[in-house]
């Protein structure tokens, strides 16, 4: 038996046209998918992409395909689905590492990323470091040295959008329009990591969130920006292919109850009725 876990993401710190194609930097948070791989017959309610990952690994290490029928995958996750929280990446990445360990192998981050994108567009939560990642083909993987400490008040909406559906939206002109802002945002992410400055990271995320309004607009976005300003928060980040929003803050410095009260006053809770206070964590899949 082997158990692994991978964090969710609160949308992306940045996503857009950077270095010649659409890329992203995920925002890993302390909400995990935990996957147990053991010997046994498959569960009836298993997640199809997790099974696809097991089959992909058997193929990768040249095991007979029928071995899959003796491998049980048990995914335990409460990460919201189809809202931009990287629930699917967490499931398949944790499945990959648990399966590899179960079969007596190891997977490095680069191989893991390659296997994940072979199944679907992938979040950079699969890397320990904050990483600029080409989520479609894994061709770019630029890691930042370290990351500032911060918390996120994650605003959850009832709205859902499958990543695959987002990728069908014509968005080339919107991506090009935001390219200059995203270049600045990527520079700020790197500066924030070097200087350990959460405000700089917030500036990067806010730039990217604003550019994303051309592609997948969030409701009452100006009210969100005003709240960030009024409460002196670090910034706001969004799911660029989902509905979730993150208010970037420090729970020891900022009054979270007051921020929640302000959300209600500005009627923002109409769009985001659920809130979760979470730490930003290091990414990567951990064996348990």
What are these regions (language model features)?
Residues 235-239:
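Short beta-strand
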Residues 1-83, 283:
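ATP-binding N-lobe of GHMP and related small-molecule kinases
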Residues 56, 60, 98-105, 118:
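Active-site catalytic microenvironments for nucleophilic, acid-base chemistry
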Residues 244-249:
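Short beta-strand->loop micro-motif that forms the acidic, two-metal-ion catalytic signature
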Residues 108-234, 250-264, 268-288:
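ATP-dependent small-molecule kinase catalytic core of the GHMP/sugar-kinase superfamily
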Residues 83-109, 125:
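DPxDG-like acidic metal-binding loop motif
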Residues 74-76, 92-104, 187, 226-231:
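Long, contiguous secondary-structure blocks with strong helical propensity
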């Amino acid at each position: 038996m082997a158990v692994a876990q991978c964090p969710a993401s609160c949308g992306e710190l940045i996503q857009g046209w950077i270095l010649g194609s659409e890329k992203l930097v995920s925002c890993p948070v302390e909400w995990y998918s935990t996957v147990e791989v053991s010997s046994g017959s498959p569960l009836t309610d298993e997640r199809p992409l997790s099974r696809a990952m097991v089959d992909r690994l058997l193929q990768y290490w040249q095991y007979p395909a029928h071995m899959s029928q003796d491998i049980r995958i048990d995914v335990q996750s409460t990460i919201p689905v189809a809202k931009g929280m990287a629930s699917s990446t967490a499931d398949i990445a944790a499945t990959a590492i648990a399966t590899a360990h179960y079969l007596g192998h190891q997977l490095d981050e680069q191989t893991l990323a390659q296997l994940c994108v072979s199944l679907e567009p992938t979040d950079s939560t699969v890397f320990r470091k904050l990483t600029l990642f080409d989520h479609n083909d894994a061709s770019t993987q630029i890691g930042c040295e370290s990351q500032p400490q911060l918390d996120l008040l994650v605003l959850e909406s009832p709205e859902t959008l499958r990543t695959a559906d987002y990728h069908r939206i014509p968005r080339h002109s919107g991506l090009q329009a935001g390219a200059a802002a995203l270049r600045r945002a990527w520079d700020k992410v790197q500066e924030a990591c070097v200087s350990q400055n959460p405000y700089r990271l917030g500036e990067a995320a806010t730039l990217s969130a604003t550019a994303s309004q051309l592609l997948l607009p969030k409701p009452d976005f100006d009210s969100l920006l005003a709240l960030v300003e009024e409460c002196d928060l670090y910034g706001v980040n969004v799911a660029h292919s989902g509905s979730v929003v993150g208010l970037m803050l420090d729970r020891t410095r900022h009054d979270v109850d007051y921020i929640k009260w302000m959300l209600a006053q500005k009627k923002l809770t109409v769009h985001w009725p659920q809130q979760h206070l979470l730490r930003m964590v290091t990414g990567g899949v951990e064996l348990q």
